[in-house]
Amino acid sequence: MQRLEPWHGHCRLQFSTNDGGRTRHQGGCRAPFKLLRAEAGDDGRCELPLLHTAGGLVGGDQLSIDLNLKAESRSLITSVAAQKVYGSVGRSRLNPDGAWSRQGVTCTLDDNSDLEWLPQEMVLYADALFHQSLRVCLPENASFLSAEIVRLGRTAAEERLNQGCWRSCLEIQRHGA
């Protein structure tokens, strides 16, 4: 059986406001990420859906997302569908460690910026190994909103996480507070 190379995708985006007060984005993504069309909210916020085209993560996949909001910019970043994390590649009784999937998100906000990071739910399949980190750096006058929904196993199919593991690290650094 042919073994496929893991994904090493990244997305780097910068948000800034124009003279009319609307937030625009620059930057781009490398597969398996794809940006869909950004919409402007009533308040000038850039509403941007992010698509993971591979359909899910398997052991060894490495994803990184870097978001940089310049002063006065506002953005809502969401995902198009649930993030699926499948069982680890190469995991067996002989190799119980398997390979971890990883996703790191770094958000850097400048003065008076506002970021809403609201991806759809994440489903960890049986025996998935997943490590995620979310790091946010923001000044006292900026705001950040996030929520996370995680399902451990596909419970409707009576599947459990079993020997899987989910590690999540959240770091928020507030300057001037």
Predicted features and spans:
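Short acidic-hydrophobic catalytic motif
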Residues: 121-124, 129-131, 144, 148-177
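Solvent-exposed loop/turn tips at the surfaces of repeat/solenoid architectures
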Residues: 67, 112-113, 147-149
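Short amphipathic alpha-helical segments, especially helix-boundary/capping motifs
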Residues: 40-42, 107-110, 144-146
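Feature marks extracellular polysaccharide-active and adherence modules
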Residues: 70, 110, 137-139, 173
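Terminal catalytic/cofactor-binding subdomain
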Residues: 1-100, 161-177
